[in-house]
Design a protein with these regions (language model features):
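Conserved cytosolic catalytic loops of P-type ATPases
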Residues: 44-129, 133-134, 236-275
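Actuator/coupling domain of P-type ATPases
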Residues: 1-50, 104-193, 479
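P-type ATPase nucleotide-binding
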Residues: 267-373, 398-400, 404, 408
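A short beta-strand structural signal in non-transmembrane regions
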Residues: 127-133, 347-349, 379, 452, ...
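Conserved ATP-binding TGD loop and adjacent catalytic N/P-domain core of P-type ATPases
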Residues: 353-485
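Juxtamembrane helix-loop transition segments at the membrane interface in multi-pass membrane proteins
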Residues: 33-45, 216-235, 529-533
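Bilayer-spanning, highly hydrophobic alpha-helical transmembrane segments
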Residues: 159-191, 197-207, 212-215, 484-516
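Membrane-embedded alpha-helical bundles of multi-pass transporters
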Residues: 11, 433, 448, 452-533
Length: 533
């Protein structure tokens, strides 16, 4: 635009040159404003983080300090309606609105000592929070960091457009003098007229709208995802999701709840007290489920003088009492009657996993159906046995499943599908899923999963809700449609304006108006993704 304005001044079209710069400057202001709308996700996210916290000192005095000065072990007072300043454990049952993290406005009940997260809102009465992470290590800080990184990683389409642009601009700079020469030497036009139309050509052939076709739209889609609890690690992941043809899914924490629940038991109260006392020394999920189920039992009468020992890989032992898997009883003379021993009140107690099958997410049923209706094959890969795999697959509507999968088996399934030229998605939440997530074309991690799984993935679903993945799939579809429409529109405008100029039907101000107008329209079209639902 600057070159065109200078050219207009050279041939004594000062007023048109000035008008060109005025229109260009006004358009730039509008473009910058529109583009900034798509990058506001970071500032909006940061607005959910309080800058100060009410720390309770050892003497009970409350001091307002910057959040970044909090350290692990500090006690913080969180009043009703306040945003929680940092990750920590609540001192009692609380109701928390986690919309800033998950996009879900329905309050979540957190039990005593359960972790609450920075940026969420205390919907109940005030409580005390024990700080478990520094301000740089909170879930919210990690989300902000991921969004920042995603916005700095261009999509494949953006990279392609940038590569084309550099070559295209060179061709325009070479082509304009050639165009002027043709008009002057072969069309019998005066130098002034030829040069003027050359400046118009320089203006209309500029690829500004084409360059803006992808980036603002991609940033808007990433921002939309962040506000809805979906984190994309760059534009490439955002674009690729819509091309997925097959989705391999882990079971626990993805289709089913990650926590075990006790559904049935056969033991008297004294036996249960012994079991709970022993399981309090274990961090195994089944042990935690048992302790949670019977947390109201009075354990004061239980003899805790004997040490509790771990039977590696099998269970726990306290004196003559064993709690564990069947192989924990391998030294018994009649191993085929484990359950009979329980019923008979034997002090050797069996706690089996068969009675603690996890429940499935209601959202998983709808998500699986939606993916299947979109012609995406959904396959369950689980390390559980055939019975559990068949049960869960049937409940959520999956017809193809494989049980007893090791991590290398999941990788093999992913690679085999890729050899058939399929675009493969893999969703999981555990360390055992990380290799498959890394090998898949699109790796999707559940936010409650391991950090290894999240590091290996391209997309992170903050809340364990498979419907969020389908939402992101539809968002990706819409992004690609908008980018395609932008590209077609911007190229069409360039072609039409170039043809009009060739036939002498275009002046410089009109050329600038249409050129800049097309760029603004392309950006605004991409910004629609900010409010997409």
């Amino acid at each position: 635009m600057i070159l065109a304005a200078i050219g207009a001044v050279i041939i004594n079209y000062e007023s048109e040159g000035a008008l060109l710069l005025l229109i260009f400057a006004g358009a730039e202001v509008l473009e910058n404003y529109a583009t900034s709308k798509s990058t506001k996700a970071i500032s909006e996210l940061m607005s959910h983080l309080p800058s100060t916290a009410s720390r309770i000192g050892a003497d009970g005095e409350i001091t307002e300090i910057p959040t970044e000065e909090l350290i692990q072990g500090d006690i913080v007072l969180v009043a009703k309606g306040e945003q929680i300043p940092i990750d920590g454990q609540a001192d009692r049952q609380v109701s928390v609105n986690e919309a800033a993290l998950t996009g879900e406005s329905v309050p979540v009940v957190k039990e005593k000592d359960e972790e609450v997260f920075a940026g969420t809102v205390n919907d109940g009465n005030s409580f005390r929070l024990t700080v478990t992470k520094t301000s740089d290590d909170t879930i919210f800080s990690n989300i902000v960091r991921m969004v920042e990184e995603a916005q700095q990683r261009p999509s494949k389409l953006s990279k392609t457009i940038d590569r084309i642009e550099s070559k295209y601009v060179i061709s325009v700079l070479i082509g304009v003098p050639v165009f002027i020469a043709i008009l002057y030497f072969f069309n019998n036009l005066g130098f002034e007229e030829s040069f003027y139309r050359g400046m118009v050509m320089l203006t209309v052939a500029s690829p500004c709208a084409l360059v803006a076709s992808a980036t603002p739209a991609t940033l808007s889609a990433i921002s939309n995802g962040a506000k809805n609890g979906i984190l994309f690690k760059g534009g490439a992941a955002m674009e690729a999701l819509s091309t997925m043809e097959i989705l391999y899914s882990d079971k626990t924490g993805t289709l089913t709840y990650g926590d075990f629940v006790v559904e049935e038991y056969a033991a008297d109260e004294d036996t249960l007290k012994e079991v709970v006392t022993i399981e309090q020394h274990s961090s195994h999920p089944i042990a935690e489920a048992i302790v949670k189920k019977f947390k109201t039992l009075d354990l004061d009468s239980v003899d805790d003088s004997e040490p509790v020992e771990e039977i590696v890989g099998s269970g726990m032992k306290k004196g003559d009492i064993i709690v564990g898997k069947p192989d924990a009883f391998k030294d018994y003379t009649d191993p085929s009657n484990y359950r009979d021993q329980i019923i008979a009140g034997n002090t050797n107690i069996f706690v089996g996993e068969s009675g603690q099958i996890t429940g499935y997410f209601d959202e998983a049923v709808h998500a699986v159906e939606n993916f299947q209706n979109s012609d995406i094959e959904v396959v369950l890969l689980t390390g559980d046995n055939e019975t559990v795999a068949e049960k869960v697959a049937g409940e959520v509507g999956i017809t193809d499943y494989t049980a007893s999968c090791l991590p290398e088996d999941k990788v093999r399934f992913v690679n085999e599908s890729q050899k058939k030229s399929k675009i493969v998605g893999m969703i999981g939440d555990g360390i055992n899923d990380a290799p498959a997530l890394a090998n898949a074309d699109i790796g999707i991690a559940m936010g409650s999963g391991s950090s290894v799984a999240m590091e290996s993935s391209d997309v992170v679903i903050v809340k364990n809700n498979l419907q969020k993945l389908f939402y992101s799939f539809m968002l990706s579809n819409r992004l690609n449609r908008i980018i395609l429409a932008n590209i077609i529109f911007s190229i069409s405008v360039i072609v039409i304006l170039v043809l009009l100029n060739i036939f002498g039907l275009l002046n410089l101000p009109t050329a600038v108006l249409f050129h800049e107008g097309s760029t603004i329209l392309v950006i605004l079209n991409g910004l629609r993704l900010l409010r997409a639902k």
